[in-house]
Amino acid sequence: MHCPFCGANDTKVIDSRLVAEGEQVRRRRECVACGERFTTFETAELVLPRLIKQDGTRQPFDEEKLRAGMQRALEKRPVSVERLEAALAHIKSRLRATGEREVKSLVVGEMVMAELRKLDEVAYIRFASVYRRFQDLDEFREEIDRLAREPARE
């Protein structure tokens, strides 16, 4: 690694330790040329797949868009931010686990529905009504009946 002080190419690691609950490595380095010390942090780069929209267009995964959609469904519901963040982390983990470079947005939508169903049934119905484009009360009733018949999968 280049020294940020003198630009020399040769630095040595004098200490390494895990930080951020094991998600990051902190390294103390020393420049062989000038003797200055500095700290670097390493994290794994975890790339999420691109999304294939229903119209065939492709776009990068947008965590903020996902969070906003789930927050909208959970608005004024008794679900903590921690539980929402855990659900988001679970969705991202499942997407990475597919090993695919691209996934259909429908797959992500179904993952969101499954997570919302575990978090809060009212939020699930709110999201489902928009996601599945309910047209009338009968479609709401059918989804509520399905919710009552089929327990949420953990």
Swiss-Prot record:
Its cofactor is Zn(2+). One of its GO terms (molecular function) is DNA binding. PROSITE patterns: ATP_CONE. It holds the Pfam family Zn_ribbon_NrdR. Negatively regulates transcription of bacterial ribonucleotide reductase nrd genes and operons by binding to NrdR-boxes. The lineage of its organism: Bacteria, Pseudomonadati, Pseudomonadota, Gammaproteobacteria, Pseudomonadales. Binds 1 zinc ion. NCBIfam families: transcriptional regulator NrdR. Keywords: ATP-binding, DNA-binding, Metal-binding, Nucleotide-binding, Repressor, Transcription, Transcription regulation, Zinc, Zinc-finger. A zinc finger (unnamed) spans 3-34. One of its GO terms (biological process) is negative regulation of DNA-templated transcription. This is Transcriptional repressor NrdR. Residues 49-139 form the ATP-cone domain. Belongs to the NrdR family. It comes from the Bacteria. InterPro entries: ATP-cone_dom, NrdR-like_N, RNR_NrdR-like.
